[in-house]
């Protein structure tokens, strides 16, 4: 009996492989652009003709000589790795050697290239399977131009199964945005149907680039942190970052939207990149969301971009052809480092203190004042207190609600209740203490669910008669309050321990409308500045408003042209 299991023909194997790598216009752009970045390009031009299923990517990278061009589209040919050991030393975006060969299976491929030190450029057209069908000399600047035409022309069903043109262009734009965030030093020009679609200008840092991609976010709404962190144990290889510079440590770049200024309705801007590539890592994304917990309003999500440049032996890229999913070693170690970096970014210190005119109304006032005056504004650096450049000095209390504080760089307005709430909440998170009460607090007509909830958060509660319950210990901050029974009843309505801690902090914090003397205000300010997340309360409300010296000078037109203020 003949065997029913047979080896697949080579062309069928190639079609299967091509389908794994190239599945859309966006995947073509991704593969070609990554080749450009691996070639050291600092300027990339992407041209698209979606109705013609045609894509062109031009770059100013190192280029290829004739021998490399003739080999470029051969199956599994690459300049990135040589042996299986190199799979643990990958410092490039590509390494499989599949993309160009897959394109010859699914489309018409043409490459023009000239090496930086070469005098001649070459144009090569490839046939099915990566065979060279035409070679000629061409005039071209150093770099490479790859043109893909008639994509999926031999697979009409593939075209029919793809989304609409508008959706595909949206996917292309998202792909380029993701890559640009990982490589902020690159200039991008994107054309569609011979018209310029959008551009991305280079920036020194990702934080400076992000407002080009998210126009609704201002530069002042972001905080960027760059850290060198030790490599985890058992990581002998040096770290290589996205632009191929060897470093003895791993590097962490973090850009966060300050929670008192910007956030999202969806978790669509929690992004993680590793060694120059955006990846899907649910464990790290959840770490980011957890670090922002109790800093944002309800049902809101952070803006956060994390880029790790780590030793390649910590990563296994060989998980799927698109390389968007990885196996990451020592993941608990990286989660700890990320949490610490986010806490540092959200803290208030002299290094990250910025002008923070939070409301649109205040901004409009400043602009109006500036527009009406014919003065010359030259911002001056205020003299800072070198002993404690970030100190706040309580000056006064307004409406028994807001503390006016003087800062070396300007003036702050702090709401006393939510500042105290943040202090108490972090104290409760660090040390959830239950203290005995005598006599016990008697509660009436609790349901079994309410009793179970109080027991879940650690309270000692027992039946004290028909429809009566005795609570014999309570959270420490509540023991001095007259409304302790009401607070315990509120805790019984559900939620986890953290929800209970928020409720206790809110109940125990000083109420708005309460007079405070100078020493009490100063103590509160000192304690609040030492919290881990001083920008918002546990419910996500902003705690303070800052008016920096430069903003005040603008509003009061303090820097006039000489003689202007005297009518000369």
From Swiss-Prot:
Membrane-spanning residues: none
Annotated GO CC locations: mismatch repair complex
Top-level lineage group: Bacteria
InterPro entries xref list: DNA_mismatch_repair_CS, DNA_mismatch_repair_MutL, DNA_mismatch_S5_2-like, HATPase_C_sf, MutL/Mlh/PMS, MutL/Mlh/Pms-like, MutL_C, MutL_C_dimsub
Gene Ontology BP, a term: mismatch repair
Job description of the protein: This protein is involved in the repair of mismatches in DNA. It is required for dam-dependent methyl-directed DNA mismatch repair. May act as a 'molecular matchmaker', a protein that promotes the formation of a stable complex between two or more DNA-binding proteins in an ATP-dependent manner without itself being part of a final effector complex.
CDD domains (UniProt xref): HATPase_MutL-MLH-PMS-like, MutL_Trans
Gene3D superfamilies: 3.30.230.10, Histidine kinase-like ATPase, C-terminal domain (3.30.565.10), MutL, C-terminal domain, dimerisation subdomain (3.30.1540.20), MutL, C-terminal domain, regulatory subdomain (3.30.1370.100)
Pfam families reported in the protein's UniProt record: DNA_mis_repair, HATPase_c_3, MutL_C
The protein's name in its UniProt record: DNA mismatch repair protein MutL
Family matches, as SMART domains: DNA_mis_repair, MutL_C
Family as reported in the entry's similarity comment: Belongs to the DNA mismatch repair MutL/HexB family.
Keywords: DNA damage, DNA repair
A GO term for molecular function: ATP hydrolysis activity
